[in-house]
Amino acid sequence: LSQRESRDENRLKRNLSLPYNMAMIERYWLPEMKGLWSRENTLRQWVRVELAVAEAEAEMGIIPADVPAELRKAFEGLDYTQLARCQDDLEKQFDHDVVAFVACLERVAGEPGRWLHYGLTSYDVVDTANALILKEACGLLVNETEALMSALRQKAEEHKRTPIMGRTHGVFAEPTSLGLKLLGFYAETERNRERLLSAMEAVSFGKLSGTVGNCSVLGADLEKRVMEKLGLHPEPVSTQVVPRDRYAQLLATIAIAGAGLERLATEIRLLARTETGEMAEPFGKSQRGSSAMPHKRNPIVCERICGMARLLRGYALTGLENIALWHERDISNSSAERVALPDSTSLLFYMTRKMTEVVRGLEINAARMKENMERFGDFYRSQLLLLALVRAGISRSEAYAWVKEASQRAMDEGISLADSALGHPQIAEVLEEGGVIEALDHDYLSEAEEIFRRVLEKN
């Protein structure tokens, strides 16, 4: 080989390990998803579809019976680097990647190669291969989601009765437990798992229905037979392509799952602030948080996840835009999907794995949680006092006004809500000391076990 040919060979080998569309940056590829969207795997799936079609056509007497075996023999040990080079060269001439692909396979196969792609249109191959890849991608996403569920469940059960102040609008509300907080994220992740399974079913449809979807060349029976061989479903009614609402469902599901990860990441970020200090994501001994400030411990993984979730929402919109193609199809979807499908699946895969690592290594500061709760007194018990007054016969509006006054005084003067209530003439007259103390004696975690039971019992 000349020096230039050697460089081209090395470039092609590198390209085979990169995504077919070269969209996702290397920084966020994980090996499993990178391999799935590699150019080599894309070409392998195209070959797989072509061979499955040839087998079915031979079985139904459409092409000679010996053709599939001859094709399989010709493609044994197929050099995908050479196939990619051939495709690249011919695509410059044809300006059509599938036409170039079929022409290259025909060269490899020799005389039996004339039966390749018999009765097919390009997207019979592309969409059916996409279904194979997307089905496997969804399987990887489900597996990662289940790993996150396991980590969340373990951490939630560990902290079932670890008290933490609940906050609404960013302001102290009433106590809850860290376990219940994490259990909520577990339940949301479980729902995202179910949505991913539904989306996996939705995208597991291929088509061999020809140029406008009427199956007039090969027939619906052959389409069904090939899909059974590939472990897919035949699209009930297609055009030249599988309807894009299927892809839109997947991209929307991915965006929803990403938003769930973003919500968890945001919670960790907020509780990791210096003035809160209740938890922190893992931080390695040799890790550095700033080029200028050695003391910094930034929640960079959670921040990264939040940024990626924004990308996923954009891809969900792309999926919706791709639904309305012209008549029996145009090609406006193609360029968008070459980016959106590998990027979105790969990003969610990365985000989910990283969040699992964060949850497993989450640093919990229970002492700081307790300190934060006690630092500002017990005015958060105001609802208990309100309910006691209502039970004693006071109108809700009047009772609310009294307790608001007592709570404000407790905050302003730094005294307990009980002392403030006993110093409030109307409250003290209605409840007296024993009634106030009894009203404020409350276990905020009394129903934690029941909530855990109803969430986890089905699992």
Residue ranges and their predicted role:
Residues L71-F75, V241, A272, F283, ...:
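A general structural motif at alpha-helix termini
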